[in-house]
């Protein structure tokens, strides 16, 4: 026997074929959401209030500070919020201090700042009763970036961009004549020396002394027309504010506000970190030859001589001096911009490979503090210096697709940015109110207007591209949605602009972003998934764990280091499957490893780190595909995506062949009920589980509080599927923290169970599995193997109209008693009633418009109390194809104190449940991207059967395997059969699972033929088929694309207003489009009359439609068709262009184009007004 038994949860053991032991537990998979939101509540909010405090009025007399805040108790708990369509939120109260400087008076007050949405334990928000997820956004990190491009003549030109978190961009570039230019905030370009002069380096000589003499600088100076700092400032002002009269003072304040004002320009802590990393001397002198000595400025001691090559060893020796004060220069420039002098470090080095021994000056920004969130003049000088160094061949360009240069904005930061917008709008209002209010009587409450804050938060949760309606089709869909990374959204990319490079897999994605799981279509590569072990650091960079290798002893230690993408670039990383002895030493002299983008073989002494696990490369969904290593990546992508579309079945079953990931994914998805503390189960029932908490004190275990866990029963999920939880523990069980107490939808015994294990044969059958179609046995229908439960919600509201209130009632005009038989006395359907399309769910009448009554009529009305005015029937009816059983009815009344939208008096919600068996036309798939549509469901007796008489369940086309290269499905098939025969579940983790030898030996252990094939007999004749067939057990899922949702037919229905043609699509109850090519087909057959009626009566001949309907009702001959409406639209279009268009008959007489008139119906015996007419609806 190969493999060892491993316990997953309380109930499931699997035989695992893994060879590599788990060094590191998988982290909590939704930590990316919860951790970020916790940060926001603990630190993010405080940071915001600090940024905006104090708000001072224009005279500087009043000052408003935000001191502290606290969150109250939510108004409704989670379940109540969902029921009432409310937002799960807590009131935010802020302590505000108002200081009046004239009198020294201080007023403190607590101000309510609106309700703040809270995150649930499972990482979601409940907004207006619906669960939503905030997707993390991948954006370019603020920093300075250098790039190069080659023009058509082969000339290399460089560019640089300083990108802040918010504020003006600064760009450097060279042109064809080798002049270096600068652009400030995307305006017209200026010679770079203009910016240096504006900073205070007024003469040419000062600039040359600063940056070193070179041809590029000389070219820029030649192009520069300014002579002094003042002239340079005016030049910049004219570019940024064309048309305004420039003055030196205005120019100074403009330049200051663009770059040096913390309120307008923000690098954020991440930008400062990246900037220092890029521009500091210690990162730039590596492998350079010094052209001047490096001197400790304080002591005057020379720490490195001229001509020294600074390799890693030499650099390490002088790094302390570099970090403190090596070659420090201080420029005290009287430029009126900033008071502090500019501190820089500058070192001359030789240009590499230059025969004339030319030098270039490297200027480093002398260690600005991490607290400085603005750009400093030293940063600008060192970035300009880096640019000139690049032109001389010193330094590196950046790869913007590298994950070291892209960071994540998670929930917390996105919320903070949104909150900041609200606060800055509020700040404006506060300032205005300060100047209007009376200083004596003013209070903080009067100054603060919380509307803009509430509005910006509401807008973010309600309509931001990153706030999405949670995909709740099954637990995996839920989990994946919370771990999604999107490059789209505000401040990100757009689909149209994103090129191939951004979408491509990059080597830095390894262990951070899944290379497999991404949507097909226009979003490919822009929406990704976080890898299974990855986490996000304080700066928003994605880190992945590695095992540290001890350099001296060359052994792999148990120390785990989390590295970001740019840190990893410095190290050599061995793969997780490198062979180790018991002490952690590498067994092979040469080890397969990665260094930057290369996969190579290196000596074992060169290893710095080792992978933690083979599955750290892929995401949670991809890690659920067994034998992933044997599948082509395109098909694996489909497999990972289709698992998310699996419909929860009525009787779920975990896969025989799993990967060991099923338990973790189910536990962290939020669909299961998980124990929050260690305890003993006291009581179990369908709707709740009670657990007595156990706490350790002084080495003894003491029982304390009782925790009650509520279970969801037959609720409706966001995707309209049935959300039901079932207990899997018994009273008396001792449960640990994080153990699963109850299965959610698509779970079995604490493991994810998206589909069912079925017996599959790879064979054709009369051509019914042509083009990936699936043939299925009727047993799967009879035994409810693929039956799922769907719940749809319908609502009807009674509003106030201009003519009076609508009324929910049983008394509906022109409706038979039979149609009302299932309504109660209020006019609402009974729970448990079986309904078909067109049945009334909620009876409702709306007052009809009546002519204004005369005084006499009003008097008679008042005296005799005549029957009330006319009403029309606006009842809620069951839409097409939604038959089922009424599961639940919820009624909300304004009178009972329920919160309803304005103008609504009563709201009724009806839930209808359907039990859907599997059908011809439903879509099925395996986990390897092998998808198909059911083409035929055969009686059990016609299915091929095995020698022992067992009929198989499903036949798949063998031609679906070779060209698609997803061989994983075949290995799963064989191993699944062996597992079924042995009565066990197996785990084959990705990239470390069963190899073919394991599969064959397990097959032999199960007593099967070693090739996994068997003789099959034709169920119709009893004869054996010519060849032996691969038969085994495969895990197959039923997908959300069900034929019931797609099949659609129309008799008459709504028409488009302008063209009068039927609408399209099932949702609009539309028709089938008979397009240009279909017209050609009928023309080719000469079917003139058929074509004429399709283009007239059945489409947009408005008069003919009505006349035809009338003729059919009366049983008369169909009249001749008239002119289609679209022809009239064409005529009107031409007339609107000033062309006089008339239509003549064959006698050259004009044909009148007329509208449909009421007198067309005068002679008809049938009351057209009462007949169900084709209605025109406003839909354009």
Curated annotation (Swiss-Prot):
A GO CC term attached to the entry: DNA-directed RNA polymerase complex
A Pfam family reported for this protein in Swiss-Prot or TrEMBL: RNA_pol_Rpb2_6
EC number(s) reported in the record: 2.7.7.6
CDD domains with a match to the protein in the record: RNA_pol_B_RPB2 (cd00653)
Keyword Heme on entry: no
Disulphide-bonded residues: none
EC top class, as a word: transferase
Keywords: DNA-directed RNA polymerase, Nucleotidyltransferase, Transcription, Transferase
Reactions that this protein is recorded to catalyse: RNA(n) + a ribonucleoside 5'-triphosphate = RNA(n+1) + diphosphate
Entry-linked NCBIfam families: PRK00405.1, rpoB
PANTHER family named among the record's database cross-references: DNA-DIRECTED RNA POLYMERASE I SUBUNIT 2
Function: DNA-dependent RNA polymerase catalyzes the transcription of DNA into RNA using the four ribonucleoside triphosphates as substrates.
HAMAP family: RNApol_bact_RpoB
Family of this protein: Belongs to the RNA polymerase beta chain family.
Subunit structure: The RNAP catalytic core consists of 2 alpha, 1 beta, 1 beta' and 1 omega subunit. When a sigma factor is associated with the core the holoenzyme is formed, which can initiate transcription.
Protein name: DNA-directed RNA polymerase subunit beta
Gene responsible for this protein: rpoB
């Amino acid at each position: 026997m190969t493999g060892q038994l491993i316990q997953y949860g309380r109930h499931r053991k699997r035989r695992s074929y893994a060879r590599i032991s788990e060094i590191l537990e998988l982290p909590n998979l939704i930590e990316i959401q919860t951790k970020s939101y916790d940060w926001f509540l603990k630190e993010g909010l405080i940071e915001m209030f600090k940024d905006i405090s104090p708000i001072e009025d224009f005279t500087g007399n009043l000052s408003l500070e935000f001191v502290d805040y606290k969150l109250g108790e939510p108004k409704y708990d989670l379940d109540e919020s969902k029921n009432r369509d409310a937002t799960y939120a807590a009131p935010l109260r802020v302590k505000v201090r108002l200081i009046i400087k004239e009198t020294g008076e201080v007023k403190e007050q607590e101000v309510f700042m609106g309700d703040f949405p809270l995150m649930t334990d499972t990482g979601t928000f409940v907004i207006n009763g619906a669960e939503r997820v905030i997707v993390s956004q991948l954006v370019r990190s603020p920093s300075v970036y250098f790039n190069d491009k080659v023009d058509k003549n082969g000339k290399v030109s460089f560019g640089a961009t300083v990108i802040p978190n918010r504020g003006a961009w600064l760009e450097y570039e060279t042109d064809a004549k080798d002049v270096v230019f600068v652009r400030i905030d995307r305006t017209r370009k200026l010679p770079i020396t203009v910016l240096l002069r504006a900073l205070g380096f007024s003469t040419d000589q000062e600039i040359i002394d600063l940056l070193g003499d070179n041809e590029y600088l000389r070219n820029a100076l030649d192009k520069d027309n300014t002579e002094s700092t003042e002239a340079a400032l005016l030049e910049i002002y004219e570019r940024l504010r064309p048309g305004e009269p420039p003055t030196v003072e205005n120019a100074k304040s403009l330049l200051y506000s663009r770059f040096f004002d913390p309120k307008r320009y923000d690098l954020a802590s991440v930008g400062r970190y990246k900037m220092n990393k890029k521009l500091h001397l210690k990162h730039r002198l590596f492998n350079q030859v010094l052209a001047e000595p490096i001197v400790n400025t304080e002591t005057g001691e020379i720490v490195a001589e001229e001509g020294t090559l600074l390799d890693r060893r030499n650099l390490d020796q002088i790094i302390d001096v570099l970090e403190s004060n090596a070659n420090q220069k201080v420029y005290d420039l009287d430029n009126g911009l900033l008071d502090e002098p500019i501190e820089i470090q500058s070192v001359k080095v030789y240009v590499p490979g230059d025969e004339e021994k030319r030098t270039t000056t490297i200027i480093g920004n002398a260690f600005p503090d991490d607290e400085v969130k603005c750009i400093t003049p030293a940063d600008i000088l060192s970035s300009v210096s880096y640019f000139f160094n690049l032109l001389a061949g010193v330094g590196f360009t950046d790869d913007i697709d590298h994950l070291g240069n892209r960071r994540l904005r998670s929930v917390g930061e996105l919320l903070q940015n949104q909150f900041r917008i609200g606060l800055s709008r509020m700040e404006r209002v506060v300032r205005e109110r300060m100047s209007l209010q009376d200083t004596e009587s003013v209070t903080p409450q009067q100054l603060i207007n919380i509307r803009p804050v509430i509005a910006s938060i509401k807008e973010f949760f309600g309509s931001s591209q990153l706030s999405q309606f949670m995909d709740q089709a099954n637990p995996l869909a839920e989990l994946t949605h919370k771990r999604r990374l999107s490059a789209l959204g505000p401040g990100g990319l757009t689909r149209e602009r994103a090129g191939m490079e951004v979408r491509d897999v990059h080597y830095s994605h390894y262990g951070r972003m899944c290379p497999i799981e991404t949507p097909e279509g226009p979003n490919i590569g822009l929406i990704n998934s976080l890898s299974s072990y990855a986490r996000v650091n304080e700066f928003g960079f994605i880190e992945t764990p590695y095992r540290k290798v001890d350099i001296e002893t060359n052994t792999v230690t148990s120390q785990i280091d989390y590295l970001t993408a740019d840190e990893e670039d410095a190290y050599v990383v061995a793969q997780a499957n490198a062979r180790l002895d018991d002490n952690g030493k590498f067994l092979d002299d040469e080890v397969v490893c990665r260094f930057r983008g290369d996969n190579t073989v290196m000596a074992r002494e060169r290893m710095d780190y080792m992978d933690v696990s083979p599955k750290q490369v892929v995401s949670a969904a991809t890690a659920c595909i067994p034998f992933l290593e044997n599948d082509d990546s395109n098909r694996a992508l489909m497999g990972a995506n289709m698992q998310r579309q699996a419909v929860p079945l009525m009787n779920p079953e975990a896969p025989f062949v799993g990967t060991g990931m099923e338990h973790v994914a189910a536990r962290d998805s939020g669909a299961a009920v998980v124990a929050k503390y260690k305890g003993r189960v006291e009581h179990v029932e369908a709707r709740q589980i009670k657990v007595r908490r156990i706490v350790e004190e002084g080495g003894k275990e003491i029982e304390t509080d009782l925790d009650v866990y509520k279970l969801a029963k037959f609720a409706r999920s966001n995707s309209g599927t049935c959300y039901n939880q079932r207990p899997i523990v018994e009273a008396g069980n001792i449960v640990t923290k994080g153990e699963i107490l109850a299965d959610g939808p698509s779970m079995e015994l604490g493991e994810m169970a998206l589909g069912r294990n079925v017996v599959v044969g790879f064979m054709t059958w009369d051509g019914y599995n042509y083009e990936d179609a699936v043939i299925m046995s009727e047993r799967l229908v009879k035994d409810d193997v693929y039956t799922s439960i769907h719940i749809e919600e319908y609502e009807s509201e009674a509003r106030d109209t201009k003519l009076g209130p609508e009324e929910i009632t049983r008394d509906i005009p022109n409706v038979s008693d039979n149609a009302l038989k299932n309504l109660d006395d209020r006019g609402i359907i009974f729970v448990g009633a079986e309904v078909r399309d067109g049945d009334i769910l909620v009876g409702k009448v709306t007052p009809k418009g009546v002519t204004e009554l005369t005084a006499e009529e009003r008097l008679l009305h008042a005296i005799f109390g005549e029957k009330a005015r006319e009403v029309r029937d606006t009842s809620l009816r069951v839409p097409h194809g939604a038959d089922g059983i009424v599961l639940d009815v919820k009624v909300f009344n304004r009178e009972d104190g329920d919160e309803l939208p304005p103008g609504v008096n009563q709201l009724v919600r009806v839930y209808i449940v359907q039990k859907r068996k599997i059908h011809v036309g439903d879509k099925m798939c395996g986990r390897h991207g092998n998808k198909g549509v059911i083409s035929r469901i055969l009686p059990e007796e016609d299915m091929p059967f095995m020698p022992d008489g067992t009929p198989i369940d499903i036949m798949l086309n063998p031609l679906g395997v070779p060209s698609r290269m997803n061989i994983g499905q075949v290995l799963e098939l064989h191993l699944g059969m062996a597992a079924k025969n042995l009565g066990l579940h197996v785990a084959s983790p990705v990239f470390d699972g069963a190899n073919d030898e394991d599969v064959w030996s397990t097959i032999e252990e199960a007593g099967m033929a070693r090739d996994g094939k068997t003789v099959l007999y034709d169920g119709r004749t009893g004869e054996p088929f010519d060849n032996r067939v691969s038969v085994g057990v495969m895990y197959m899922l039923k997908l959300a694309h069900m034929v019931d949702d797609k099949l659609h037919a129309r008799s008459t229905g709504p028409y488009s207003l302008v063209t009068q043609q039927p609408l399209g699509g099932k949702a609009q109850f539309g028709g089938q489009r008979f397009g240009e090519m279909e017209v050609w087909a009928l023309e080719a057959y000469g079917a003139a009359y058929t074509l004429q009626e399709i283009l007239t009566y059945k489409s947009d001949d408005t008069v003919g439609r009505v006349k035809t309907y009338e003729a059919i009702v009366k049983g008369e001959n169909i009249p001749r068709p008239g002119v289609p409406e679209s022809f009239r639209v064409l005529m009107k279009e031409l007339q609107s262009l000033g062309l006089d268009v008339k239509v003549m008959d064959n006698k050259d007489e004009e044909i009148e184009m007329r509208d449909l008139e009421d007198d067309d119906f005068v002679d008809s015996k049938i009351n057209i007004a009462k007949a169900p007419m084709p209605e025109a609806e406003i839909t354009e």
